[in-house]
Structure formats: C-alpha cells, structure tokens
C-alpha cells in the first residue's frame, strides 16, 4: 500500500479528521514504513515517490547503526551512493525530509548533481582506503557548499511537496487566504454541498485534470480539487473547459462559482455545475465593489482619509460610533480598496468590523 497514492491520501485525510498528529517525513525521526508511537503516526519514508523501499531502508539502517545524521554534510558522508540517485534525492528533498537541517528545500534541490558527485567521490575514497573530505572530523557544524539558488515561495514549496507525496501534508495552498475567503464568503466544497444555497463560491487547488471527448466529439473535463477540508471532483462542460484550458494546471488554485442542479426527486442528490472559474490571485487582488467599515469611538479620521485617498472602483461606506449612536456616511467618490487596504485597516484598533 505504500505506493498507492490514492489509498495513502484517504488514509491521511482520515487521520486528520480524527485529529491524530502526523509526524512529517524526517531523516532522523521517520521510519521506512508508517509507525504509530504514543498516539502519533510517523510518516513512512518508503511512501515517498521515486525513493524506493530498499534504498530508504539502507539509509535508515545506517542511522540506527551509527546514530542520527547531524548535518546534511554528515548525511552525504555516510550514505551509500547506490541508495541516492537523482530521482531518489529529489523525492526526499521535496517531501521535506531534510527540513531539520535547512528549510530552504530548493537550496538542496538545486545542488543535487553536485551532491550526487560528492557522494560518489566519498564512496570511492572509502573503497580506496583514502580519507574522505569529512571523515574523521566532527560533522555537526560542517556545511555543504551549495550552489547559488532562489528560495521557493510557499506556493512553489507546496507544489513540489505535492509531486513527491501525491497530496499536501505540511500545509495547504489555500490556508493563507482563510481570512479573505471568510470576508468574501468563499467556502469549502463540503460547506457548499451541505447548505441550502443554490449557488456559491468555492475555493480549490487542482490535484489532477483529465480531458475527454463525448461520443459526438465534444470535449469535457474531470477535475479533482483539494481544499482544507478534503477533496472533491467536478465535471467541466465544454464551454468552461475550453475557455479556461490554458490556466487549468496542477497545483494552481481557483475560486469556482458553483450551482446546484437537482436532477431527481431525491433532494439529497445534487449535481454540481461549474458556472465560472477565476484564479485565486485574480479574485483577491481585484478591487471590492462595495465595502462598509465600522469604526469605534476612538477612530482616527485623518489616518483613514489618508488610507482611502486613492480614487478607484470601490464604494466606501463608513459607520461612525459616537456616544453609543451610529452615523452612516458614504464617500462621494469611489476609492481604491483591495486586499492591501484590507490587511492594513483590519489591524487598526479603532476598526470594529469590515464587511463586503
């Protein structure tokens, strides 16, 4: 079952639902197989794509025999070249196995050809009874000379982690948008499916997309999405598929306008139609149509005026509290108000509430 990504994904989702802590892949904490210890589940490194059960078992046997790997350089010095080819090392890095040494995963990934060659050189030296670069030294603080690189942004890190595991484990791409999603009434698929609304906005990150054709040759798509609550699958009719084909890629996140279509007399059975697709970035960065800002008694009107001084597309309404009374004002001209303004204003102590 270690190589069955679908089963593993379901297994991990069930553990999350049961609030069982999952110890993420670690070169010094994990085992080749999944193992439960003290109510926690340690992720099995043999389940990482391209790594191979035998290879990771050999690497972990070395750890058990001679102690934990102290640094990444220590790992390089001790590992056998036959257990770490390019694909195997890529899988380990992308899954976060070496995060305890350095959370900058792309630093290691970008230097893999150099690392592989270094491991081979060390192995050859050992076979020839020559002292290796680090042999006989304390490697605790030794560093490998990595090549120049650009650190991954969180979105890139999670996309690469997804490739190595088949699902998101350390975090989810949608988590960073939680607050703005709440403000915009963007919900999880499960929330939308269970509520009574006929239409709603749902956010999802693409896990896979399959394009097919009907008997009449009309294209359609079947897309599997992931959100922070789980996974869901949607059917894309030809018009939606064709107009969005170029941007529908794995690991990209979207806000979907969904509509329930009850096709049977059984009200519990609902077909969900996709009416519109927008990238998350487009949604959160575009100006809001209308915003109401409720202010406490200690509001700073001059500061608010400065923050809302730029003309734009958003209708701004202010609700001012004074002596337990509320006064409503609408700014004469529309102003610029997007995610940037929201982030600044929501943290002001005199702002009671911002609604859209």
Task: Please give the residue ranges for each predicted region.
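Noncatalytic, beta-rich nucleic-acid-contacting surfaces in large DNA/RNA-processing enzymes
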Residues: 1-356
């Amino acid at each position: 079952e270690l190589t069955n990504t679908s089963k593993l994904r379901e297994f991990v989702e069930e553990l999350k639902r049961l609030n069982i802590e999952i110890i993420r892949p670690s070169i010094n904490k994990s085992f080749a197989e999944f193992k439960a210890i003290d109510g926690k589940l340690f992720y099995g490194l043999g389940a990482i794509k391209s790594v191979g059960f035998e290879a990771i078992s050999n690497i972990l046997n070395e750890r058990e025999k001679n102690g934990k790997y102290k640094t990444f350089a220590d790992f390089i010095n001790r590992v056998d070249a036959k257990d770490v080819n390019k694909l195997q090392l890529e899988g380990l890095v992308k899954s976060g196995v070496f995060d305890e040494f350095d959370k900058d995963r792309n630093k290691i990934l970008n230097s893999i050809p150099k690392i592989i060659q270094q491991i081979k050189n060390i192995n050859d030296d050992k076979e020839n009874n020559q002292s290796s670069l680090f042999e006989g030294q304390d490697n605790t603080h030794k560093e490998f000379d990595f090549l120049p690189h650009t650190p991954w942004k969180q979105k890139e890190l999670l996309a690469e982690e997804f490739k190595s595991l088949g699902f998101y484990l350390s975090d989810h791409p949608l988590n960073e948008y939680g607050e703005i999603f709440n403000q915009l009434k963007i919900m999880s698929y499960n929330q939308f499916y269970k509520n009574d609304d006929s239409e709603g906005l749902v956010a999802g990150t693409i896990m896979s997309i399959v394009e097919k054709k009907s008997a009449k040759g009309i294209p359609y798509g079947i897309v599997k999405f992931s959100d922070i609550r789980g996974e869901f699958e949607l059917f894309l009719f030809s018009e939606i598929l064709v107009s969005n084909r170029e941007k529908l890629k794995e690991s990209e996140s979207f806000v979907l306008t969904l509509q329930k279509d009850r096709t049977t007399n059984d009200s519990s059975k609902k077909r969900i139609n996709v009416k519109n697709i927008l990238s998350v970035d487009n949604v959160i960065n575009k100006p809001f149509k209308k915003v109401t800002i409720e202010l406490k008694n200690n509001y700073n009107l001059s500061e608010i005026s400065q923050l809302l001084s730029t003309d734009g597309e958003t209708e701004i309404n202010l609700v001012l509290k004074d002596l337990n009374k509320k006064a409503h004002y609408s700014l004469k001209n529309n102003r610029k108000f997007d995610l940037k303004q929201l982030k600044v204003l929501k943290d002001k102590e005199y702002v009671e509430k911002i609604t859209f």
